[in-house]
């Protein structure tokens, strides 16, 4: 008499952001049931209340899965010469839900992969809801998960609820680490003066969709730039007393903080004028240029690239309307500020992203100390695959460190401790970059046998590292 196979117990994923959604997808695709817990929800009207009660975080505006808060860009899609583009390529090979939805809902952005936020989130939500092995529970997990949840992926992101954050910190015995995260304004395109601004991508570089004019550019002469910097420095900022000693992450600095570091900082950063030519005055180079990037598929909303800010809302409208072309700007959303929280992963996590003192808990996303949408989703992809393999009684090692995925694992689980001998005593969030991968010899001769010019050898080295990464990932996948 045959007996039915014992049903596989579900894995619980806490958090429906990019990391949690990716983790849930990877687990379910491996044939393991998942319960995805997301605290953002709409509650029925209570007696006497008008309309539904919305449960949100300080930064989220919807209850959609994988809502993108800070920007709509997944950054460069160039796998040969850019580390985040390489990470895109690796994740596509591994059936990433986030990259698939991003590809489906991309908007023009030069060489970057940017998406229509609403369409992207709706697509992720639709696929998760439609998967037969995924159940969504709209509820907050307060405190540590119940003990009978024997496999949990914690992907609660930078805005982890206080109850869960406190429970994790008590369990770990570590102090909380945090940094500011700021949001850039979004503008209605019809309010941009295109008699002043123009469409062009830097160096006319084409993006995945073939558009070489994916940005709106607003030029400034020196006098306009100096006046703008003065107003930026003098404008009233939002104060957060409890966060005064929290460090900023350099990859998402508020624009006024960059200006405080030096008056020329912005024109060598997000306002750099290189690679752009004003068609109305092609012989005169702008002193600085503000760029806007398409934010939705309709092309009606555009975000100010690199203009995350903690200026008070009234000051934002006044200061940003000083920018030529934006003098009549109508803002669909003004910038804002929220706190980001992450754990001391090198001390707390093993190489399969499990908590050493509580192996039933895995972590993914920004809480692990990666920075950026793609990096967060990548750790969700790995945590999901690790958890599914464990549930199925298999062993799955991390990808080799020569891959972008493996390099991220190395960063969050070991790079910090190695650096302590050099006096680096604080673990900080990190974007993917070639510096996290083991170096290769710098090539001197190309595939065609021709000597590579000295100034091009750096790019050639990046391409070699990318080719090595994809080959090593293929080998890892074959043995997984």
UniProtKB/Swiss-Prot annotation:
<dbReference type="InterPro" id="IPR002218">
    <property type="entry name" value="MnmG-rel"/>
</dbReference>
<keyword id="KW-0819">tRNA processing</keyword>
<keyword id="KW-0963">Cytoplasm</keyword>
<dbReference type="GO" id="GO:0047151">
    <property type="term" value="F:tRNA (uracil(54)-C5)-methyltransferase activity, 5,10-methylenetetrahydrofolate-dependent"/>
</dbReference>
<dbReference type="InterPro" id="IPR040131">
    <property type="entry name" value="MnmG_N"/>
</dbReference>
<protein>
    <recommendedName>
        <fullName>Methylenetetrahydrofolate--tRNA-(uracil-5-)-methyltransferase TrmFO</fullName>
        <ecNumber>2.1.1.74</ecNumber>
    </recommendedName>
</protein>
<keyword id="KW-0520">NAD</keyword>
<dbReference type="GO" id="GO:0002098">
    <property type="term" value="P:tRNA wobble uridine modification"/>
</dbReference>
<keyword id="KW-0285">Flavoprotein</keyword>
<feature type="binding site">
    <location>
        <begin position="15"/>
        <end position="20"/>
    </location>
    <ligand>
        <name>FAD</name>
    </ligand>
</feature>
<keyword id="KW-0274">FAD</keyword>
<dbReference type="InterPro" id="IPR036188">
    <property type="entry name" value="FAD/NAD-bd_sf"/>
</dbReference>
<dbReference type="GO" id="GO:0030488">
    <property type="term" value="P:tRNA methylation"/>
</dbReference>
<keyword id="KW-0808">Transferase</keyword>
<keyword id="KW-0521">NADP</keyword>
<comment type="similarity">
    <text>Belongs to the MnmG family. TrmFO subfamily.</text>
</comment>
<keyword id="KW-0489">Methyltransferase</keyword>
<dbReference type="GO" id="GO:0005829">
    <property type="term" value="C:cytosol"/>
</dbReference>
<dbReference type="InterPro" id="IPR004417">
    <property type="entry name" value="TrmFO"/>
</dbReference>
<dbReference type="InterPro" id="IPR020595">
    <property type="entry name" value="MnmG-rel_CS"/>
</dbReference>
<dbReference type="Pfam" id="PF01134">
    <property type="entry name" value="GIDA"/>
</dbReference>
<dbReference type="GO" id="GO:0050660">
    <property type="term" value="F:flavin adenine dinucleotide binding"/>
</dbReference>
<comment type="function">
    <text>Catalyzes the folate-dependent formation of 5-methyl-uridine at position 54 (M-5-U54) in all tRNAs.</text>
</comment>
